[in-house]
Amino acid sequence: MTAILERRESTSLWGRFCNWITSTENRLYIGWFGVLMIPTLLTATSVFIIAFIAAPPVDIDGIREPVSGSLLYGNNIISGAIIPTSAAIGLHFYPIWEAASVDEWLYNGGPYELIVLHFLLGVACYMGREWELSFRLGMRPWIAVAYSAPVAAATAVFLIYPIGQGSFSDGMPLGISGTFNFMIVFQAEHNILMHPFHMLGVAGVFGGSLFSAMHGSLVTSSLIRETTENESANEGYRFGQEEETYNIVAAHGYFGRLIFQYASFNNSRSLHFFLAAWPVVGIWFTALGISTMAFNLNGFNFNQSVVDSQGRVINTWADIINRANLGMEVMHERNAHNFPLDLAAVEAPSTNG
């Protein structure tokens, strides 16, 4: 009898690392995108927490008037924010080693640029990690495609808009009231409410909420009863069961009679594709709208577009919005310039004397 002993090849340390990184048996999948995602998101999160608590005021407008954003400098959870990098820095890459000191780096809002750039890289890698895990499990790639919508929106407000406006100081502050301030100023300067891409985004978000609520309530109302009246209907479901958990025919019939027949999906797959695609496409359009308005391709301007036979203006809601925009622009950066840009651009009347 002859025994053949096969020598087991020793796997290198790099090989074991590659196998561990790409293994779908791990409790949390890491993947090659995760190798970059983990340090970037940890860096962004750590600096955000420290800066939100203790960062000193930042000279956001570049006029030696620092704005406080951290908790230790008088703010609360609502008013606190990471103040964007100073207009004096503009679009320059501003890591710590480019400043003369850490104090100067903090005064010019260096943490904002650090957080934003690491965050955008991290969420892009998270999207790639979703695709990578789907690929290794033999799934279709639509999870990553859906996640591309919020990634595009974040990239638009944190990167594309500052590039178009010429300074990171125009980026969205990282805080609750800072976000509201960004929205108000954006409306004042770009008339975003009158931009069709923003309208599509509103339809996507509100429509997606409506469709999600309709779908969830229809499914919950047409569950196949597997329990007694004294038990929760949820107890009748077992994870991984092959049987349908709700009666799609009953849900289809109800909704078809509630509105009209063809308003109801009779294909569960096309229904769920629609539920995913509607808000995703809407948010894509919003991100595209922000990116175009970044370069001052603004919303529609219907100011003074209705006049009577004598040429007198008949005010419409467009004129009311325009007046509100001017008021918001007057209050924005009120110490950085004497007049809002729209008013300062008007040619001064000639004087005789």
Curated annotation (Swiss-Prot):
Membrane topology summary: Multi-pass membrane protein
Record field: catalytic activity: 2 a plastoquinone + 4 hnu + 2 H2O = 2 a plastoquinol + O2
Residues bound to chlorophyll a ChlzD1: 118
A single BP term in Gene Ontology: response to herbicide
Record's comment on post-translational modification: Tyr-161 forms a radical intermediate that is referred to as redox-active TyrZ, YZ or Y-Z.
Site (Stabilizes free radical intermediate): 190
Modified residue annotations for N-acetylthreonine: 2
Enzyme class of the recorded protein, top EC level: oxidoreductase
A GO CC annotation given for this chain: chloroplast thylakoid membrane
Protein name in the entry: Photosystem II protein D1
Free-text remark on how the cofactor is bound: The D1/D2 heterodimer binds P680, chlorophylls that are the primary electron donor of PSII, and subsequent electron acceptors. It shares a non-heme iron and each subunit binds pheophytin, quinone, additional chlorophylls, carotenoids and lipids. D1 provides most of the ligands for the Mn4-Ca-O5 cluster of the oxygen-evolving complex (OEC). There is also a Cl(-1) ion associated with D1 and D2, which is required for oxygen evolution. The PSII complex binds additional chlorophylls, carotenoids and specific lipids.
Binding site for pheophytin a: 126
Site (Tyrosine radical intermediate): 161
Localisation: Plastid, Chloroplast thylakoid membrane
Keywords of the record: Acetylation, Calcium, Chlorophyll, Chloroplast, Chromophore, Electron transport, Herbicide resistance, Iron, Magnesium, Manganese, Membrane, Metal-binding, Oxidoreductase, Phosphoprotein, Photosynthesis, Photosystem II, Plastid, Thylakoid, Transmembrane, Transmembrane helix, Transport
The EC number(s) this enzyme carries: 1.10.3.9
SUPFAM superfamilies: Bacterial photosystem II reaction centre, L and M subunits (SSF81483)
UniProt GO molecular function: chlorophyll binding; electron transporter, transferring electrons within the cyclic electron transport pathway of photosynthesis activity; iron ion binding; oxidoreductase activity, acting on diphenols and related substances as donors, oxygen as acceptor; oxygen evolving activity
PTM sites of type Phosphothreonine: 2
Annotated site location: Cleavage: 344-345
Gene behind this protein: psbA
Organism this protein belongs to: Magnolia fraseri var. pyramidata
Function: Photosystem II (PSII) is a light-driven water:plastoquinone oxidoreductase that uses light energy to abstract electrons from H(2)O, generating O(2) and a proton gradient subsequently used for ATP formation. It consists of a core antenna complex that captures photons, and an electron transfer chain that converts photonic excitation into a charge separation. The D1/D2 (PsbA/PsbD) reaction center heterodimer binds P680, the primary electron donor of PSII as well as several subsequent electron acceptors.
Binding, chlorophyll a PD1: 198
Classification via HAMAP family: PSII_PsbA_D1
Miscellaneous note of the record: 2 of the reaction center chlorophylls (ChlD1 and ChlD2) are entirely coordinated by water. Herbicides such as atrazine, BNT, diuron or ioxynil bind in the Q(B) binding site and block subsequent electron transfer.
Oligomeric form and interacting partners: PSII is composed of 1 copy each of membrane proteins PsbA, PsbB, PsbC, PsbD, PsbE, PsbF, PsbH, PsbI, PsbJ, PsbK, PsbL, PsbM, PsbT, PsbX, PsbY, PsbZ, Psb30/Ycf12, at least 3 peripheral proteins of the oxygen-evolving complex and a large number of cofactors. It forms dimeric complexes.
